[in-house]
Amino acid sequence: MLNLLYCFDSNYNFQAFTSIFSFLERSSEKINLNIIHKDTSKKDIFPENILKHTNLNELNIYRFDRKFQTFPKVENSHVSEATYYRLFFNDYIKNIEDFESVTYVDCDMICLQDPSFEIIENSKNLVESEYVLAARKEKFETIEMEKIIKNLNLSSSKYMNAGLLIIDVNKWINENLTQKLCEKLLQIENNIVYWDQDVFNAYLDGAFYELPESLNYYTNLEDNLIVSKEVKIVHYYGNKKPWTTKGIFNKKSTYYQDMFRELGLGNYHITHKRRRDSVRHFIRGIFNLNIIYLKKPVSFLIDFLISLSKKPNII
């Protein structure tokens, strides 16, 4: 059994649904799905293909109602305050004491192959270790890493990426980590760059169990290199996403768009932060012949024109 945790708001519903569906489709294990949502606690927001999926064991959705002082760096960014909700997961998930571990997944991650064995094995290793969290080690250029170390006052150069986290629930509760992380957040509020990821790193200072890259593989939409067959989960890392016009023209956006299509929500998921930029990327994609990478170019043209009439998205 996999215990998955997602935290998101209404602006990220489709992205979250697509990510969740990819895990349900690829996993050989049943999945307990726990959602902390900014706007609702109603299950009827989920598509039927998720609600009736044979791999879904249980779905619990909780509306975030915790009053907190601040959620730094979310204004005018591609990240919402919902990224911070995972700091409070143990206040929401029912019967949390029955869980050995929970795996948090970012909404911009897509499961390509069955990750069950690796998640279960790494969860066991985490529980048997001294660590409370398991994550992939981040790879920064030396200059950037030096800035982060100085900014967060770290003694370790081991900095984790929080896109996929395996959490030892018992250690988290026993060590009162929610309170300690909130205290750390307020201490470093003015130095935060990478949202709650910085909070985790400032508190843990390199003390985490390291996951393989196959469970959190950075997918760069600046090139068209194919992802290795060993990769289980791709992470659309950074602010260039496969549901934006610029991102869709990249071959690797198909991992996301194919799953969105299988979910039954439409042919293409397209959002706009600034329509003028989207139109420019659209025209450039056609003249550069990048449109040949799309499986359904005519459907994309139609969906793009329709999407221009919809409310702009913040992401």
Language-model segment annotations:
Residues 109-146:
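Conserved donor-nucleotide/metal-binding helix-loop-beta segment in metal-dependent transferases, i.e.
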Residues 32-39, 135:
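Short internal beta-strands
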Residues 46, 51-95:
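Active-site-proximal specificity loops/subdomain of glycosyltransferases
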Residues 1-2, 8, 167-315:
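A glycosyltransferase accessory/donor-loop signature
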Residues 102:
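Short aromatic/hydrophobic "clamp" motif used to bind/position activated sugar donors
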Residues 1-21:
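N-proximal low-complexity "stem/linker" segments adjacent to membrane-targeting elements
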Residues 105:
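Catalytic metal- and UDP-sugar-binding loop of GT-A-like glycosyltransferases, i.e.
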Residues 22-30:
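Short, acidic, metal-binding catalytic loop of nucleotide-sugar glycosyltransferases
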